[in-house]
Amino acid sequence: FSLAGNRLSLYGQDGSLKVYDADTGALLTDVNAGTIGDDQRVTLDCEEDGFVWMELRDADSYEIAAIRVYGPEGLVSDLSSLNETYNYLGYLTTDANGRPLYYGTRSVPGSSYATGCDVLDETGNVVMQGLGSCYSYYDNSLNALPDHVFVARRGFYYGWMDTDGNWLYCQSIFSSVNADDELGY
């Protein structure tokens, strides 16, 4: 099971995947996600509107074998093929239509430590690229970000960006007089 905010997701041994609204008890998602093998572990991350991020990992090596997104209508996408492109995949926020958006971090060619971040739709298509980083850091906290907004860094700027790629608030990473003395991000 997974409890995220006011969403409870349950994955049964028979492959059933159910998502409930913890406040009202309403059933948001009721699908069959298939069973997993004895040599796999499952991780669930319940997102907004009944969407579930499911990772299947090898029980011994913990390598990701599959990443699937389920919604109220069943399997939305199998993002397993993106494991070869991205070092990490995760939930970001929803778009203005309530559909989930994800982020993928990848190594930048020619650099041993730099990473880039792409914003992906639920089918794995890139909807925004060229970000240095992006995350929904304030999610589920007292300082939650507005709907359809995430923290991003692009070039020498960081701040709040909407899902259309517009800055709602940004500042230079060199915003301090003592920029050389501070990390800035």
Show the residue positions of the predicted features:
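Residue-level detector of conserved, function-critical positions
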Residues: 1-185
